[in-house]
Each structure stands twice: as structure tokens, then as C-alpha cells.
Amino acid sequence: MGHIFWNDLSRLQDSGETVDVLAIGDSWFHYPFNNLVTPLHGALERPTIYVIGENGARADELCKGSWLANLRKLLGWYPQIRLVCISAGGNDFAGVGDLDDKILAPNCSGATSVAACYRAAEPDGVFAAVGAAYRSLLAEVNALRPDVEVLVHNYDYAIPDGRALLGVRSWLKLPMDNARVPTAGAPRDGLRREIVRDLIDRFTLCLDDVESTSPQPVELVWSAGMLADTEWANELHPTPSGFTKLVNDCWSGPARHALGLP
């Protein structure tokens, strides 16, 4: 029975365990109250999982610097790795400074459609950068372990209702407030929810293109549309049971197959 190690290489080495699954990503792998990794560990019959990254990590951060160095290190040191999981991109198109400053027009108050709320050439430009970051990560995996299966995922349709963590700014509602997106029907319906759905759908197309053009075996875990509105803990994260549902219904099958489990 293996354990989960979050950015703790010394503890991994002291344990004497080898790594079966390598994960790199954002809060969907690191969120303290539950995440995808914890229930995935159980669904895969408790392999050793090493997790790189942190809450708030962007795709364009994970593909360089110390995160990338650690990815290379783990792939080189542990030939037993049979699966790589990536969770990235959400922080590139959510949050103050990204959603409002890069994607949404400065004043959407008169908008009646999603397209009317976007800046020129966006969000295509943002997703082009996200796709490039994924391709960079996959190229690193391919250079060291071209045989390893890689799983990526497309999150789900979050609710822009302003719920966040204590001391953390809203990721969706506040940027939409800044851009004066109409509030009719919000937060569960209306233009604001349509923007979230459109961004997730465009992100899915981005990942689909990455999957279809990568020399590495990549599978898109389709989780968008799985969660009920009551299964969100806040604007970006499912409840503990919501994360478990996504693992059981979406992740478990392809991940077990990658590890040779029935």
C-alpha cells in the first residue's frame, strides 16, 4: 500500500516507496478539504502518488521553473511511473487580473450575449497560451517516458456566486462585477453562468486539440456537466463528495486501465 506525497521529495525518499502515479497541477489536486487525488488514491487501490504544484498554479507556471524541474526529476528517477495526471488551466482564465483584465470587455453592461462580453481575439488568445503550456508539459513527459498514459480533465461548470475561501477574493463574481456583466438570472443562470459554460467548453476544445495532436498517449477525462449545483463548495471547488463523484464516475476507469487494474 502506497501513500500520497505532496511536494515532499525528502519524505518520499525516506519512505522507500517507488512512484506509480505522478500528478502535477492546481488546487483540484491540492485543495486541503478534498481534491481529486485523495479519492483517486482509493479508487486505484492505494498506489504511491507524488503530486507537484500548488493551489492557484497556472498552466503557464507549471510548465517551467521548479515545477518543471521536479517533473523531470521524478520521471527520471522513478521508471515505475505508469500514469501522469495534469490539472491546469483554470487559474489562467479565472480570477481578478485574468478573467476581467484579459478576457472580459471593460464594460459589458449592455451585453446580451456571451460573445458581446469578450475582448477582441479573446478568449482564443488565453486558450492558445494554455494549449501551449500543455504541449510543453507533454513534450517533457514524451522525452523521458513516451509510453506513459497522461490524463487531463476539463473541470465543470462552476457557479459565479462569490463564494471563496476566507481571505481570498472571488474568482468569478468579482471579475464579472469589475466588467459590469449583467446580473439578471445570476448566479445559477443568466449571462454570467453562460460565460462560465462557454469558457469551460472552449477549454474543452483546447484540450481536445492537445489530445488529438500529441505524440504522447493522452486521454481527456470529461468531467464537465457531472456535478449538480449543490455539489459545489465555492466558485472553483466541488464539495468533498463532489470530488469523490468525479473520481468514481470519470477518473477511475481510465486511471485503473492505465495501471493495469480491472
Stretches found by the model and what they are:
Residues 161-219:
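Substrate-gating cap/lid alpha-helix
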Residues 1-19:
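Short N-terminal or domain-adjacent regulatory/targeting segments
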Residues 20-22, 28-125:
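Conserved SGNH/GDSL esterase-like catalytic core that processes O-acyl groups on lipids
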Residues 126-177:
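Hydrophobic, aromatic-enriched interface-forming segments
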Residues 110-131, 137, 189-196:
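Surface-exposed cleft-lining segments at the edges of enzyme active sites
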Residues 30-32, 92-96, 158-164, 228-231:
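Short catalytic/ligand-binding loop motif for oxyanion handling, primarily in non-cytosolic enzymes
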Residues 53-54, 217-233:
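Acidic carboxylate-rich catalytic motifs and surrounding loops in phosphoryl-/glycosyl-chemistry enzymes
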